[in-house]
């Protein structure tokens, strides 16, 4: 592993935190203001609900074939280059969305999103390689909070621009494009190259297929990816339709964004709570906190379908964001501590493979369910997360040391090894 001496884990974490924050800010604005943008380019209001779900699936579908390739390219050649690539493509995506004048142009912009993804797992792998083991839970918790904080800031800033400055949503995405260019410059100047403990050799395709096969060979990884994938299906159902729920509860039209801004602030508050999950997991264990966070997420989705006002919706959604962020941090920490070094980097690079499947499946299910009523989407999302909860409990009981016949006192004191 080669790390620039002047850049310890604190500085690398800070740079990657900013990178993830800005990406979350821009992506959240696509989720929050996609209804606005659709109406601005001429889509009838009656068609917006179905198109939101279909475009949400398109968001991830285009990038699915590249998932294993980004990680292989990063480990074989340069993690830094792959991360900078993501920021530059973000700038192009947000620029196209900002400049769109017709629905087909907006569709093209959404297709390009698939080429910007694939950086989060690479950043997590680099953080894992430079962070001391006893600070890993905290580091992963802090990093996991960056994207949700961006997700909260994006709608808040965008709502201010649209309602107070009377700008179109195109200007919102133009600012996101400029911020992404700034991130690319920041990484190029300020970040060092962190090489994996084991640098892969061989052809790109062989390594990519090998990384995917490696996931299937490890029971812990299989369980975690299934659990995470089911959580993401429910999460993406709710996230894709959150803006529409806000407008429904607040009884506002799609061209008004004032109610979306406070939801963004709720996301910020929820994300700010999430590092506490990392701290608690260092004390109690990753498995326990994972199960608790998934249970909390299912309850919040039910509550979101029942709340009578935007204020209560803000509160509940903030709690949902905290739970979602903690789930991600716990999955990352379990993979970082329990996967062997020779496969750890490849596994972390693929950590958002479940996000792609959830991102395709969740909005597609939502597009089918929304015909029965908007709140039905959130009830179904809660049911999906409840399935993930059952799987998480089974994972915790079947993959821990006690389930494998290993005495607890014979193991080093690692929180991830404690079972329910």
Explain the meaning of each model-derived region.
Residues 1-9, 194-225, 408-420:
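Juxtamembrane intracellular "pre-TM" segments in multi-pass secondary transporters
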Residues 33-49, 241-257:
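Short amphipathic helix-loop junctions that connect adjacent transmembrane helices
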Residues 54-70, 265-276:
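Central cavity-lining transmembrane alpha-helices of secondary-active solute carriers
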Residues 64-101, 281-284:
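Conserved MFS/SLC helix-loop-helix module at the cytosolic interface between two early adjacent transmembrane helices
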Residues 93, 104-118, 312-326:
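Hydrophobic core of transmembrane alpha-helices in multi-pass small-molecule transporters
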């Amino acid at each position: 592993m080669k790390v620039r001496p002047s850049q310890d884990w604190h500085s690398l974490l800070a740079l990657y935190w900013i990178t993830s924050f800005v990406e979350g800010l821009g992506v959240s604005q696509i989720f929050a203001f996609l209804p606005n943008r659709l109406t601005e380019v001429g889509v009838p209001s009656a068609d917006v609900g179905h198109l939101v779900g279909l475009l949400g699936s398109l968001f991830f579908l285009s990038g699915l074939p590249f998932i294993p390739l980004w990680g292989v390219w990063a480990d074989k050649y340069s993690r830094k280059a792959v991360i900078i690539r993501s920021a530059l493509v973000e700038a192009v995506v947000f620029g196209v969305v900002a400049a769109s004048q017709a629905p087909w142009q907006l569709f093209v912009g959404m297709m390009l999103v698939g080429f910007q993804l694939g950086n989060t797992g690479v950043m997590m792998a680099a953080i894992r390689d430079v962070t001391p083991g006893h600070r890993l839970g905290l580091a992963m918790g802090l990093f996991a909070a960056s994207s949700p904080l961006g997700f909260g800031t994006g709608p808040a800033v965008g709502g201010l621009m649209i309602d107070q400055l009377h700008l179109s949503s195109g200007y919102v995405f133009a600012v996101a494009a400029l911020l992404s260019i700034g991130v690319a410059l920041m990484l190029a100047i300020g970040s060092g190259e962190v090489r994996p403990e084991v640098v892969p050799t061989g052809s790109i395709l062989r390594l990519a297929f090998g990384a995917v096969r490696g996931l299937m060979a490890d029971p812990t990884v299989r369980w975690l990816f299934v659990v995470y994938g089911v959580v993401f299906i429910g999460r993406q159902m709710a996230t894709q339709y959150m803006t529409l729920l806000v407008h429904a509860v607040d009884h506002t039209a799609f061209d008004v964004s004032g109610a979306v801004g406070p939801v963004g602030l709720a996301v910020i508050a929820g994300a700010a709570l999430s590092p506490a999950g990392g701290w608690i997991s260092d004390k109690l264990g990753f498995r326990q906190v994972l199960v608790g966070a998934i249970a909390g997420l299912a309850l919040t989705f039910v509550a979101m379908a029942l709340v009578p006002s935007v204020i209560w919706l803000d509160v509940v959604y903030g709690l949902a964001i905290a739970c979602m962020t903690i789930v991600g941090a716990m999955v990352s920490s379990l993979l970082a501590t329990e996967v062997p070094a020779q496969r750890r980097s490849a596994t972390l690079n693929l950590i958002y493979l479940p996000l792609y499947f959830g991102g395709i499946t969740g909005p597609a299910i939502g597009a089918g369910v929304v015909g029965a009523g908007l709140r039905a989407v959130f009830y179904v999302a809660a049911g999906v997360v409840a399935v993930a909860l059952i799987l998480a409990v089974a994972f915790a009981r079947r993959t821990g040391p006690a389930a494998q016949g290993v005495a607890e006192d014979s193991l080093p004191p690692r929180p991830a090894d404690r079972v329910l």
